[in-house]
Amino acid sequence: GKEYYEYLVRMSTGTSYASVDELTDAVTRRIDEDAAAMANELTAELYLEMLSYSFSETEPDAILADLKVQTKQEFPELPECSCTIKAVPEALELSLSPAFYLTPPMDRFQDNVIYINGSEEYADTPLYTTLAHEGYPGHLYQTVYFSSVCDDPIRHLLSFPAYTEGWATYVEFQSYFFDNGLSPELQNLLMRNQAVTLGIHALLDLNINYYGWTKDQTAAFLEETYGITDRETSDRMFDAMVDNPANYLEYYVGWLEIQQMREQAEETLGSSFDPMEFHTLLLDLGPAPFTVIRAHFQSWLVTAPLTQGDLAA
């Protein structure tokens, strides 16, 4: 029932929002904000670009190498490590995601593996941003960084999926703004489009599993709000939410918490905002509930201008 779903939301997201109602309002506001920005920015030329764009690097090894270099601009250095890219066995393609990172043993974080799914089902999934999510500066990067700075083994046993998936989603979205062959206008549009798409899934997760939407209500919402008229698509989305309640919240709510902190820091610090310092704060804290992370962030927000002033002097 509702109480169990509330428990799932708390456990899977560690969100700083006090209730599911407040969280739903925040998710809705963010989707509306990104959708409105897209509507204002979209032109006929940009729409055509969206249909046929290509990143400057398209091969997995070249993409990872490029991401590794670009990550150094706004993210702290990693200790020496390697990454092997492997193909998902054909027999497993239909049951696995477009790509995934295998978490290494805590005492052997230097050796990393990313699997890429070659299924035609994922042919339209951009490999560049996918590898940013799984590799640099996503799961691989965050795992290696935390393993290199964490001296408390028990923390490796604790699971805070909204931090890890939220971080990977945040940097996936940030990778749209890397030097990747796309125009700034297209980068912004693509990033917002991904955010809206993920947000819709998170909103459906909440409305179906907490507020009790039926398949008919789900189909009506998707048609009226986003113009999705295919009933098979809406039914498939409904079933996915029922099968894995709170799953999409790990990604979207995790990203939303981090993005909100970044935007607050940018607004508060102005020209003193340093992405490197912000990212280092989150990485040093490591996986934790956002109720805990927000408290540390607020303290950092007060001291950051003083620290950066000392560095500048």
Regions found by a protein language model. Give the residues of each.
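N-terminal maturation segment of proteins
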Residues: 1-313
